[in-house]
């Protein structure tokens, strides 16, 4: 039996309400904007145009990623395939920064501290109190967790997501399946860091645009054929990544 390579399709959710208002979102369950809905649909259309149709979808427990998956699948006429939702694909928890405006936070704490919280590998923001407005401490969807995070750095996301990827998702890709992961900027940065062996320092420079599929081809042995992945709309991806990099400006 000849084994074929599988495709791992990474799709960051479309623009959310707090992307549009330049706020730290983390685990706060905000919805997509109309622009974000259109981005998600376009992501699905790109899958069809490039003949990269998913067999299964993995997403987080946050509606912006779930709805992005649903809209993309509908546009690709793959609404019928299995969808697996797991908290380990959630966005990074931004701690006490959740809900704060990025530009105002940058002005208050300075560029160096702002970038350390936002882009360093091992520096988490201050913890969010359990009784704070944007805490998830009492959220029923996390009732089976031993404890809900109060803050996270990217290293924490790597430690919760990559073992799940290795155990649950990668084996399907190695069997030749096309697997769509509809998730978040930082959960996808954690995965790309792992796939491309990006250093702890260099990962600060990686930005994932919204709504544009990034495809990795993976052999049955688990080798990435195209390091760095292939965006299905490279021009839009470059512009989108630049916009993400500039968040925090006026």
Swiss-Prot record:
Q: Which residues form the active site?
A: 13 (tele-phosphohistidine intermediate), 91 (proton donor/acceptor)
| EC code | 5.4.2.11
Species annotation: Corynebacterium efficiens (strain DSM 44549 / YS-314 / AJ 12310 / JCM 11189 / NBRC 100395)
Please give the catalytic activity noted in the UniProt record: (2R)-2-phosphoglycerate = (2R)-3-phosphoglycerate
Recorded protein name is 2,3-bisphosphoglycerate-dependent phosphoglycerate mutase
Keywords assigned by UniProt, alphabetized: Gluconeogenesis, Glycolysis, Isomerase
UniProt site (Transition state stabilizer):
184
Q: Which GO terms describe its molecular function?
A: phosphoglycerate mutase activity
């Amino acid at each position: 039996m000849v084994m074929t390579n599988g495709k791992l399709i990474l799709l960051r959710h479309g623009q959310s309400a707090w992307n549009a208002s330049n706020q730290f979102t983390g685990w706060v369950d905000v919805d997509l904007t109309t622009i974000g809905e259109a981005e998600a649909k376009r992501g699905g259309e790109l899958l069809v145009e490039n003949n990269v149709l998913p067999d299964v979808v993995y997403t987080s427990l946050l509606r912006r990623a779930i709805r992005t998956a649903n809209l993309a699948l509908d546009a690709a006429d793959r609404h019928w395939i299995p969808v697996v939702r797991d908290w380990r694909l959630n966005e990074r928890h931004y701690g006490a920064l959740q809900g704060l405006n990025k530009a105002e936070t940058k002005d208050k704490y300075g560029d160096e501290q702002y970038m350390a919280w936002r882009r360093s590998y091992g520096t988490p923001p201050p913890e969010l109190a359990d009784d704070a407005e944007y805490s998830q401490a009492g959220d029923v969807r996390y009732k089976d967790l031993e404890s809900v995070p109060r803050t996270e750095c990217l290293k924490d996301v790597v430690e919760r997501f990559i073992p799940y990827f290795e155990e649950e998702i990668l084996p399907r890709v190695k069997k030749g399946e096309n697997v769509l992961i509809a998730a978040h900027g930082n959960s996808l940065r954690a995965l790309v860091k792992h796939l491309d062996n990006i250093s702890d320092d260099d990962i600060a420079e990686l930005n994932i645009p919204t709504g544009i599929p990034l495809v990795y081809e993976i052999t049955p042995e688990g080798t990435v054929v195209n390091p760095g992945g292939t965006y299905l709309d490279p021009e839009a991806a470059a512009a989108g990544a630049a916009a993400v990099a500039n968040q925090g400006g006026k």
